[in-house]
Amino acid sequence: MDDIRKIERLAAASWPAYFQKSIGKWLLRANFGVTKRANSVWTSADMPEGDFQLEAELFYQSLGLPVCFHISNASPKGLDDALADSRYEKVDECFQMTALCRSIMSRTNDNSRFTYKWEQEPSSVWIDEFIQLEGFSPERHKGYKHIFERMPPCKTFFKMYDKESLTALGTVSVIDGYGGLSNIVVAEEHRGKGAGTQVIRVLTEWAKNNGAERMFLQVMKENLAAVSLYGKIGFSPISEHHYRIKR
């Protein structure tokens, strides 16, 4: 359980919201509605005193956001059932996966046809290209900018090209010996050609060179292709989480 709590803590630290408010050891997080992770109650710690549900509902309602709880294997027992009884809907079941850096490097091969660009802080162009590849609304730019600015300082925002064609993007931040992967997206026309594996390899190498021994990421359970890819290159699930949203 200690390892699970650590991963959940690092995952929260690597994806910080614009607004964060403590409620005991939990965190109320809000980020203009961009990503559930940054707009949910982080609950991977002991239960707070008082009426946490009312406090959360007042917090999110005051911001005009859905009331959402992040429930993991490290959350207090009985919390998920209590929220279900209060008509909170279960959505977005995910794995937290981890791998040793050396395992990833030994299971992947460098592909020299790709070229790379790196940014310590993401430019507006990087954010726009990420949003475009993901197929998201341009209105999400501000929300992502706030998250990316607040990530731990040891981080990089990466672009990969095949010749001059933008192929993929990704981000890694290093904290407490772990590299947290996020924002990995491959352009549709380049999928199925090894680009995803190469992004993870290159970002893992960067993280390893900046003090990481292990990597972690989160992935939707229903994304079977991604779960399979991550498993082949050394990742295995350490924890599961989902969200409960007030309907």
UniProtKB/Swiss-Prot annotation:
SUPFAM superfamilies: Acyl-CoA N-acyltransferases (Nat)
Coiled coil: none
Sorted UniProt keywords: Acyltransferase, Transferase
Residues in N-acetyltransferase domain copies: 102-247
Gene3D superfamilies the record matches: 3.40.630.30
Enzyme Commission number, as recorded: 2.3.1.-
MF GO annotations: acyltransferase activity, transferring groups other than amino-acyl groups
Family: Belongs to the acetyltransferase family.
Protein name (database record): Uncharacterized N-acetyltransferase YobR
